[in-house]
Amino acid sequence: MMRDFPSEDGIMMIGGASAVDIAAEFGTPVYVTDEQRLRENYRNVYNAFARFMDTKIHYACKANTNLAILRVLEQEGSGIDAVSIGEVLTCLKAGFTPDRIMYTGVNVSDKELKQVAETGVMINLDSACEMERLAEIAPCADVSFRITPGVGSGHSAKVTTGNKGAKFGIPLDQVISTYARAKDLGFNIEGIHAHIGSGGQVVEPFMDMMEVLIELVNEIKGLGIDLEFIDMGGGIGVPYKPQEEEMDVGELAMNLTDMIQEETDIDTIVLEPGRYIVCDSTVLLTTVNDIKDTGVKKYVGVDAGFNTLIRPAMYDSYHHVALANKFGKACTDKYDVVGPICESGDYIAHDRVLPDPQVGDLVAVYNAGAYGFSMSSRYNSRPLCAEVMVNEGKAELIREAEDFEDLWRHQIIPERLAR
């Protein structure tokens, strides 16, 4: 089920702190993360797998790269799945050591490959071409390979990554020859990796993917290569709607680890949850600026748009909304919750029943921790918003809101155009 929040005197509480007080102190829009929920989510997924076999969690930091959130997960013992040199450097700054980071890029330049290799992190290669280029840059690097399992799953076609013909990974008919070539090149080959997509809520596609990986592991063993781990990627979804059922992660863990232990000599499973760990730890708070009744539709206009949270506009994703200052009150009518961006596609929610919204009310947007701030932009010249973390009822700023100077801080007017 979707996460529920407590209230006090009709006010939504996040991690023991009043949503209204947080908005008053830090302004809106603002992302608010409950530190304890973050820790609980990490422990839930780790313990589900670790009771069956040696487990490494590589948090998919593309979901949320705030340094404070990364520090919490570093303290919990997480590793990192990074997809760019920027993410690698961010995680190193947050305190992760190189041995806890695996880099999985796609369509990577030689410049970035060199930068990544110099950090000492493991490189999960996406193509035979990338392998040949890395051999010139770091011939003894620790590597794994991302394969295309021919199995795809996700909340949207835009995030389904494992299907045949996808841009990600090494096609199945090239996997064995690629591993053989990597051995000849002298790489330290440690594992095999696949990722079927993001936000899946069904166990079966993960099992189908694991069957493919296991068959490949045993073929690769015939090359004289003993792999240390199978990396099942990420993609474990969470419920976004109030009555939506949650995937049974315990069942998933039991099924996948049973398959590995019964059919291979692999000792370690790696998984890369991002959404599962951070999604429901965070709420986006946004203030109602305008109410409009067109006679066809009623609108609640808020100060967060797709510049702040793009998932509804990009993926047609559902995010539950509630009035944080009228929490639990009877709802009166249906409204679209829309933002300040000058496009018709700028919306947070369609046709939601709300309790008589008024200018100045505070809208809470649920499940905002994954691919929220990390996908935000300055479109329409609107500065990026603040982020806050709550622990034991105390709210602390973990990212300052930008000011207008930040919009043009790195821009340069050539002297010939100066007055």
Task: Locate predicted features.
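Flexible loop/turn segments at secondary-structure boundaries
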Residues: T65-A68, T90, S109, G152-S153, ...
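Short beta-strand segments
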Residues: A60, S144-T148, H193-H195, D231-G233, ...
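Charged (often Lys/Glu-rich) extended helix/loop segments that serve as interaction or gating elements
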Residues: I266-R419
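Active-site loop/helix belt of alpha/beta enzymes
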Residues: I137, P149-D290, N380-R382, N391
